[in-house]
Amino acid sequence: MLIKRSFSLSRHRTSVALEPEFWAVLDSEAEKAGKSLAAVVAEIDRKRGLRPLASALRLHALAAAARGT
């Protein structure tokens, strides 16, 4: 099951659908960094290049999980 969340990125709204496990890692990372989830997503968005946002978020979450964060 995918969970869809919406964010404002670069002055426009976008929605991203990810599995709950990926959202849990991203939520945890944001909390530990003292940032909002939207701020973390915006940082990933700025660094993703041509990669689709959902893919960039999944890869970021996998890397965070591998680091144990």
Language model features by range: what are they?
Residues 13, 17, 36, 52, ...:
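Amphipathic alpha-helical recognition patches that constitute DNA-binding helices
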Residues 1-17:
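Short Lys/Arg-rich basic patches
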Residues 6, 40-41, 51:
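Helix-centric, low-specificity signal for extended rod-like, repetitive segments
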Residues 3-4, 45-47:
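Short, solvent-exposed loop/turn elements at beta->coil junctions and helix N-caps
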Residues 21-46:
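Surface-exposed, Lys/Arg-rich phosphate-binding patches that contact polyanionic backbones
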Residues 46-69:
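C-terminal structural segments of small proteins and small subunits
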